[in-house]
């Protein structure tokens, strides 16, 4: 757990560093290190998640890792905005199509399987009557 916490602090420092070169690659490497740790040290990955992470990296992700509780959940991949549509199409063709064709997922379920998202502020405390949700 210590190394994962250290990665969180490294990521925070990196995101705040305006002078950092190759920031996308560095952030991606932190994500990939996190996945390797989950897979190797904590054994909370699965063959399917490892395959998705590998395919993500082969298709231009800066980094990828399992997210959620593991043992079957999902991955998050760090992809450039201009590559996201091609990335989604490639992951669909190389992973999800075979599961769709085999009847393991339906077309309706597929819409919930792969989609773009953006970073957000995350969880916070909101004090009613305060205009600042972070520092009430």
State the predicted function of each range:
Residues 64-74:
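Conserved phosphate/anionic-ligand binding catalytic regions in large, soluble enzymes, centered on
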Residues 1-63, 77-136:
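C-terminal nucleotide
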